[in-house]
């Protein structure tokens, strides 16, 4: 059991290291607000007009302290945008904390977010526990998958956003917290409100600065720059010099990428591991040139969940 735990910890650290390096690669983008200058300085990563415009909006919003709501399908890069907002803000030298609202058990999420006072329950820390909201004080709290937050926690979060005060579980003393909120979802929250699954008042509290990130299929000009960047990254990681053939690149361009950037990254990583030659050919790429349908239909706006992640 000990050896298994050590192995799992090592694998987690490796994955975190890779993600950190990729995020840093993504964030080698211009801080300029002017679209022409932004295009000139970032030709290697995003060349589509949609993303050049989006990054201009991100740069403007980042300078404020406004609450931000990121909308987009699974895998479009909402995490990267959230971190960029933090990196360009006045809070950049403070803490950035990401909370995956969909992965924390419902019976634990209250204490995870708000913390608890000493002696609140049997087995609790004698000194109490600081919550993630409090831990992010002065910095940015990224609430990923906000649409998965249970209704009781939506109420508590709304109260916090109204007063910017928290009260640890088991405590009677409120505490003022200065933190910027960035939330993200791949769900259509207006549809969720109509179904009684999301509070309308919380939605309007979050809907201050809204950034809608287009899917990869709608910005074809970004596919090859991203694919080449991932290939350079994973080629370097695995000590290989790799390149795509023209036919392979054509195949990548023709595919519709229902899993967006994450699907592209995972595919390229797999190719970097399994390719027998330095040139990756179309026959090596495990996708069809014909567009594959997304896992769920477009009937519900932004509700395109493939695996519940963003």
List the model feature ranges, each with a label.
Residues 1-3:
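Sensory-domain boundary capping and coupling elements
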Residues 7, 147-148, 158:
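Catalytic acidic motif of RecA-like/P-loop NTPases
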Residues 7-67, 71:
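Flexible nucleotide-interacting loop at or near the entrance of a catalytic core
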Residues 57-123, 134-150, 215-220, 267:
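Conserved post-Walker A coupling segment in P-loop NTPases
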Residues 91-94, 170-180, 187-294:
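Nucleotide-binding/hydrolysis machinery
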Residues 127-138, 142, 150-156, 167-186, ...:
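AAA+/SF3 P-loop NTPase mechanochemical coupling elements
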Residues 298-310:
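Bacterial C-terminal helix-turn-helix
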């Amino acid at each position: 059991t000990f050896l298994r735990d050590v192995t799992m910890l090592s694998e987690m650290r490796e994955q975190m290291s890779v993600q950190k390096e990729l995020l840093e690669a993504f964030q080698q983008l211009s801080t300029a607000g002017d679209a022409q200058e932004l295009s000139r300085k970032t030709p290697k990563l995003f060349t589509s007009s949609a993303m050049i415009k989006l990054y201009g909006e991100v740069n403007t919003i980042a300078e404020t302290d406004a609450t931000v709501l990121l909308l987009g399908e699974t895998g479009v890069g909402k995490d990267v945008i959230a971190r960029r907002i933090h990196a360009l803000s006045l809070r950049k030298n403070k803490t950035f904390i990401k909370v995956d609202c969909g992965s924390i058990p419902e019976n634990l999420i209250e204490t995870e977010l708000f913390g608890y006072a000493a002696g609140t329950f049997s087995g609790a820390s004698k000194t109490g526990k600081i919550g993630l909201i409090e831990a992010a004080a002065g910095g940015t709290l990224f609430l990923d998958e906000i649409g998965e937050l249970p209704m009781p926690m939506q109420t508590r979060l709304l109260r916090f956003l109204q007063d910017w005060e928290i009260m640890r579980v088991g405590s009677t003393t409120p505490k003022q917290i200065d933190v910027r909120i960035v939330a993200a979802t791949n769900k259509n929250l207006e549809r969720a409100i109509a179904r009684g699954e999301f509070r309308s008042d919380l939605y309007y509290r979050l809907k201050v600065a809204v950034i809608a990130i287009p899917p990869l299929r709608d910005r074809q000009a970004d596919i090859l720059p991203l694919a080449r960047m991932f290939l350079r990254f994973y080629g370097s990681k695995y000590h290989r010099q790799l390149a795509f053939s023209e036919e392979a690149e054509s195949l990548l361009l023709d595919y519709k990428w229902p899993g967006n950037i994450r699907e592209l990254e995972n595919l390229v990583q797999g190719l970097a591991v399994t390719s027998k030659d330095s040139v990756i050919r179309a026959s090596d790429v495990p996708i069809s040139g014909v567009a594959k349908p997304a896992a769920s239909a477009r009937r519900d706006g932004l509700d395109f969940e493939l695996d519940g992640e963003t």
